[in-house]
Amino acid sequence: MAVPKKKTSPSRRGMRRSHQALTGEAYTECSNCGELKRPHHVCGHCGHYDGREVAAAGNSGRGLKGVVRV
């Protein structure tokens, strides 16, 4: 089996792991209703995207579950 010839230094180990950092999810305000939504996604509360209504929320009261396209 292959075995490392030298011990990996903490600096090299850190440089290798520098791309593994986690970032939190970004949220923006819906321009129609003011609720928080993901950027570039349809608002789950009112169904608007980019100033237009693209989906109507069903009567279930659970956001866009059972979406009806407009």
Curated annotation (Swiss-Prot):
Keyword Ribonucleoprotein applies: yes
Keywords: Ribonucleoprotein, Ribosomal protein
Segments of skewed composition (Basic residues): 1-19
GO MF annotation list: structural constituent of ribosome
One GO term describing the cellular component: large ribosomal subunit
Keyword match Ribonucleoprotein: yes
Region (Disordered): 1-21
Gene3D superfamilies per the UniProt record, alphabetical: Single helix bin
GO annotation terms (biological process): translation
InterPro entries for the chain: Ribosomal_bL32, Ribosomal_bL32_bact, Ribosomal_zn-bd
Family in the record: Belongs to the bacterial ribosomal protein bL32 family.
HAMAP family given in the database record: Ribosomal_bL32
Name of this chain's protein: Large ribosomal subunit protein bL32
Organism the protein comes from: Granulibacter bethesdensis (strain ATCC BAA-1260 / CGDNIH1)
Classification of source organism: Bacteria, Pseudomonadati, Pseudomonadota, Alphaproteobacteria, Acetobacterales
Record gene name: rpmF
